[in-house]
Every structure is written in C-alpha cells, then in structure tokens.
C-alpha cells in the first residue's frame, strides 16, 4: 500500500536541497583591500558559492542588519552560511566584527573565518577562542575554500537531517494513528 504523505512532511521535502536543485552556499566576504576582495570573491565563485562582498566591518554589520544607525536588510530574509573577514581593517577589525556577530542571536551560529597575512599566534588564538571557525593565512588558496565549503555542506546536511527527524517526531505526536499505521505498514 502507498505511504500517505502528510502536508508537513511534503513541505520539508520541497525545501530540501537533496530533492531539488541545491542552493549555493552564501558567503559574506569582508576585506578593505580591493585586490583581496576580488581574489576571495573569485575563489568562492569558482567553488560554486554565492558571494556578497563588502569593504569594511561596518558595511558587513549594515548588510546583516546589525548596525545601530540604519538597518539595510531585514535578517529574517537573509541567509548567510559563512562570513569570511580580514583581520586588519581600518575602523573595526575582523576580531571586533567576529565578537559582534557572536553576540547576535540571529547570526551567532553562522561560522566566521578570519583571514590575515600576519601569522601572529596570540591573535589567532584569541579569534579561535572568541568563536572563529578557522583562521586562514593570506593568500587564501582554493583548497582552503573547498575545505570550508565541504565542511559547511556536511553541517548543513546534518542540520537538515535533524530538522526532518524533529518534524517526524512532531508528526508522530500530532498524528499518532498515522504513526501506528506506518509502523504496521497497513
């Protein structure tokens, strides 16, 4: 007998990248150097990522809707899977941006990767302790970007699987007769 698909379960399937065309990872790249911004943008696009680039930590906060003065984007509509930021920037450093992102309830779970041309161990340790996903030395290589992308894809898949399992448990609680029939394969 054919399995009955409940509307909530169908909704999950329709939004899954596993069953439709996969949504590219969206990366927010932050760097004050025009050359470095273009370089990282190119690496990310070659790795099949959607990329948004900004030239400062302040602009990144504006883009995310986390600035105090003016909210440019409502973060309920914004899906960013990864933030890559330079460490040394005028105004606000990448470390300060990292702290603000990790303080935000809307974006604290988004991985932040710090990039720098300076290999200063206390700086690297401080960023990692504050919650940075990784610290990359410039010039960033394509292999670095691919490793990050693959790691994020695994996390996204795990997150999606957990959401399906949660919805199935909710469905069992809401439709206990259906769950019993499903188990009995009637």
UniProtKB/Swiss-Prot annotation:
Belongs to the ARR family. Type-A subfamily. The modification 4-aspartylphosphate is found at residue 86. One of its GO terms (biological process) is cytokinin-activated signaling pathway. Pfam families: Response_reg. It is found in: Nucleus. Its main location: nucleus. Induction: By cytokinins (BA and zeatin) and nitrate. One of its GO terms (cellular component) is nucleus. This is Two-component response regulator ARR6.
